[in-house]
Amino acid sequence: MGSLIIEDLQEGFGKEAVKGKEITVHYTGWLENGTKFDSSLDRRQPLTITLGVGQVIKGWDEGFGGMKEGGKRKLTIPSEMGYGARGAGGVIPPHATLIFEVELLKVYE
């Protein structure tokens, strides 16, 4: 079983993302072979989620933890913390490692 790899690309200086907080993010996701499968930037539409409650894949719930507003990270997410054996929507194959570049735009009180 692989483990989540978190690389800080840019440190944030705003409020901190913690479990139970609602956050707004931008993201782009790639497969290991470089195929981009999704990007909120391409849609110009950020995503708002509640952190740590299972709304998103486990790699996101853990990967955004401790991040501060304005920060950017690269998350390398093993299959077990992504979509696992089932894959997703015909776009993400089974057992795929996922690579995301994420930006934390806002943490809500």
Swiss-Prot record:
> Known EC number(s)?
5.2.1.8
* Sorted UniProt keywords: Isomerase, Rotamase
Q: For this protein, what is any one GO molecular function term?
A: peptidyl-prolyl cis-trans isomerase activity
How the protein is activated or inhibited is described as: Inhibited by FK506.
Q: Which InterPro entries match?
A: PPIase_dom_sf (IPR046357), PPIase_FKBP_dom (IPR001179)
Q: Which SUPFAM superfamilies match?
A: FKBP-like
Domain of life where this protein originates: Bacteria
What Pfam families does its record include? FKBP_C (PF00254)
PROSITE patterns this protein is in?
A: FKBP_PPIASE
In what residue span(s) does the PPIase FKBP-type domain sit? 20-108
What catalytic activity does the UniProt entry give for this protein? [protein]-peptidylproline (omega=180) = [protein]-peptidylproline (omega=0)
From the UniProt record, give one GO term of the biological process aspect: protein folding
Q: What does this protein do?
A: PPIases accelerate the folding of proteins.
Q: Which family does it belong to?
A: Belongs to the FKBP-type PPIase family.
Q: What is this protein called?
A: FK506-binding protein
Q: What species does this protein belong to?
A: Neisseria meningitidis serogroup A / serotype 4A (strain DSM 15465 / Z2491)
